[in-house]
């Protein structure tokens, strides 16, 4: 139907030859059937020829390639390290030279020992810090006039020869006792206590500033004073005011600091304290809470009690020994004077005993004025109500009332302190004072 006589196409797409032109053809294998579901790769002529053949097994080849890459990285790292060493070599040589200069300046280390006995000008017996004693030589450049038994010396680290004398240094505990910065409190910050201020000025301050007045009148100024009274009456405050008003060296120590753990350390600390005070004279030694070491002597049953008594005996010796104290004044403070040893309070050691009573009405008013001078008070505050009260107030109690009133105002976000704040503060302070420590709290 509708087809011409020329014939159709064969399986390969070639036109079939006409029936009349029949010739014999060579055998050709049939083309493989096309794979279903897989796309054939297109072969590119020149690129396919240049591509390397597939090598098997591929896993071992990849591992070897990875190993070679790691070896290459290590070789590059080594090369970089060698280059850095060559570059840093001049800097290391300079650092080594600087270290050698520092070592030369520092010198060889020396050990510290004690001189036990001088044999002659060139030999001595010394003891090291380890313990043994040695017969050693004394080098020619050592100042032999300063050599005396018991002094500290410097010894060569290897041959233990005496190469120098170690000057006595201040005990670190004593250096801490020195007040470097004068306290801010002055006599104007003390409410009342006019008589006490006058007495301490005559006994402590005036002999240091104008000693010629005592020479003209023919008397020796007092060696020391003791301040005693109830807690919070201004004993330590007055001592701070003395330190503020005078230019003398002020050494402050608490009595409990003189009690040391090891035998003999307490008396040694007392001697060192007064030696430093003598070197830095004119000076004032203030020992607070003297009742810690100055209690009455009795038969001690333990080593600690005997050590406290030895410390007090050394204190008595320093106050009234053969060596004159000169420009060194002593101020003691305690609130238990009845427990002190009578030998400590006798004239010649402590010449003036200054009592600090509870403040009277005039003193209360002055103390309230001092502590409220920088406070912002409302108009309804009446301080006379607290001044005229019958409760026994100390100066510390009045300060606590003013501070507590300010805290109550801050709690309510107010910038002014009102009269009810002072009333609540007074009730709180007096309640705590009367209540005291609950019985059995520390049992």
From Swiss-Prot:
Organism: Arabidopsis thaliana (Mouse-ear cress)
Biased composition (Basic and acidic residues): 12-28, 87-106
Binding site for ATP: 229-236
Database matches in InterPro entries: 26S_Proteasome_ATPase, AAA+_ATPase, AAA_lid_3, ATPase_AAA_core, ATPase_AAA_CS, NA-bd_OB-fold, P-loop_NTPase, Prot_ATP_ID_OB_2nd
PROSITE patterns, A to Z: AAA
Region: Disordered, residue numbers: 1-55, 87-108
GO CC list: nucleus; P-body; plasma membrane; proteasome complex
Descriptive protein name: 26S proteasome regulatory subunit 4 homolog A
Gene Ontology molecular function, alphabetical: ATP binding; ATP hydrolysis activity
GO BP terms in the entry: female gamete generation; innate immune response; lateral root formation; leaf morphogenesis; maintenance of root meristem identity; male gamete generation; meristem growth; meristem structural organization
Induction record: Induced by treatment with the proteasome inhibitor MG132.
Record bears the keyword Cytoplasm: yes
UniProt xrefs under Pfam families: AAA, AAA_lid_3, Prot_ATP_ID_OB_C
Similarity comment text for this entry: Belongs to the AAA ATPase family.
Keywords: ATP-binding, Cytoplasm, Immunity, Innate immunity, Isopeptide bond, Nucleotide-binding, Nucleus, Proteasome, Stress response, Ubl conjugation
Linked residues for Glycyl lysine isopeptide (Lys-Gly) (interchain with G-Cter in ubiquitin): 296, 433
Main function: The 26S protease is involved in the ATP-dependent degradation of ubiquitinated proteins. The regulatory (or ATPase) complex confers ATP dependency and substrate specificity to the 26S complex. Interacts with transit peptides of proteins targeted to the chloroplast, and may be involved in the degradation of unimported plastid protein precursors. Is required for the maintenance of postembryonic root and shoot meristems. Has a specific role in the regulation of organs size. Acts redundantly with RPT2B in the regulation of gametogenesis.
Quaternary structure and partners: Component of the 19S regulatory particle (RP/PA700) base subcomplex of the 26S proteasome. The 26S proteasome is composed of a core protease (CP), known as the 20S proteasome, capped at one or both ends by the 19S regulatory particle (RP/PA700). The RP/PA700 complex is composed of at least 17 different subunits in two subcomplexes, the base and the lid, which form the portions proximal and distal to the 20S proteolytic core, respectively. Required for innate immunity. Interacts with UNI.
Deleted gene: phenotype: Displays disruption of cellular organization in the postembryonic root and shoot apical meristems. Leads to decreased 26SP accumulation, resulting in reduced rates of Ub-dependent proteolysis. Shows hypersensitivity to heat shock and increased oxidative stress tolerance. Displays enlarged leaves, stems, flowers, fruits, seeds and embryos, caused by increased cell size and shows increased branch number and nuclear size of trichomes, in correlation with increased ploidy. Mutant displays enhanced susceptibility to the fungal pathogen Golovinomyces cichoracearum.
Tissues expressed in: Preferentially expressed in the root and shoot apical meristem.
Compartment list: Cytoplasm, P-body; Nucleus
């Amino acid at each position: 139907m509708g087809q011409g006589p020329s014939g159709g196409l064969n399986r390969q797409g070639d036109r079939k030859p006409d029936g009349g032109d029949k010739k014999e053809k060579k055998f050709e294998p049939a083309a493989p059937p096309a794979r279903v579901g897989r796309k054939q790769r297109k072969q590119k002529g020149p690129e396919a020829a240049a591509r390397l053949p597939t090598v098997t097994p591929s896993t071992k080849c990849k591992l070897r390639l990875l190993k070679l890459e790691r070896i290459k990285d290590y070789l590059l790292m080594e090369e970089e390290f060698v280059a850095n060493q060559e570059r840093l070599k001049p800097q290391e040589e300079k650092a080594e030279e600087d270290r050698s200069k520092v070592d030369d300046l520092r010198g060889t280390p020396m050990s510290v020992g004690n001189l036990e006995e001088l044999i002659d000008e060139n030999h001595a017996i010394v003891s090291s810090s380890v313990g043994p004693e040695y017969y050693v030589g004394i080098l020619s450049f050592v100042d032999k006039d300063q050599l005396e038994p018991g002094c500290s010396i410097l010894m060569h680290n290897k041959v233990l020869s005496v190469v120098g004398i170690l000057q006595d240094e201040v005990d670190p505990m004593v250096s801490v006792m020195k007040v470097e910065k004068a306290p801010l409190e002055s006599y104007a910050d003390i409410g009342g206590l006019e008589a006490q201020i006058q007495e301490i000025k005559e006994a402590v301050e005036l002999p240091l500033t104008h000693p010629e007045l005592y020479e003209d009148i023919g008397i020796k100024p007092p060696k020391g004073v003791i301040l005693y009274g109830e807690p919070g009456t201004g004993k330590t405050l007055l001592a701070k005011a003395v330190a503020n008003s005078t230019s003398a060296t002020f050494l402050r120590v608490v009595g409990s600091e003189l009690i040391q753990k090891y035998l003999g350390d307490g008396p040694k600390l007392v001697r060192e304290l007064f030696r430093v005070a003598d070197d830095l004279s004119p000076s004032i030694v203030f020992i607070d809470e003297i009742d810690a070491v100055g209690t009455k002597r009795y038969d001690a049953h333990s080593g600690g009690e005997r050590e406290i008594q030895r410390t007090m005996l050394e204190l008595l010796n320093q106050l009234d020994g053969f060596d004159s104290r000169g420009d060194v004044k002593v101020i003691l403070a305690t609130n238990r004077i009845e427990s002190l040893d009578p030998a400590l309070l006798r004239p010649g050691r402590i010449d003036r005993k200054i009592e600090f009573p509870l403040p009277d009405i005039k003193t209360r008013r002055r103390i309230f004025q001092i502590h409220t001078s920088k406070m912002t008070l409302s108009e309804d505050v009446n301080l006379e109500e607290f001044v005229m009260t019958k409760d026994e107030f100390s100066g510390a109690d009045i300060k606590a009332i003013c501070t507590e009133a300010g805290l109550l105002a801050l709690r309510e976000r107010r910038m002014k302190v009102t009269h009810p704040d002072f009333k609540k503060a007074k009730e709180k302070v007096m309640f705590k004072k009367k209540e005291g420590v609950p019985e059995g709290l520390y049992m």
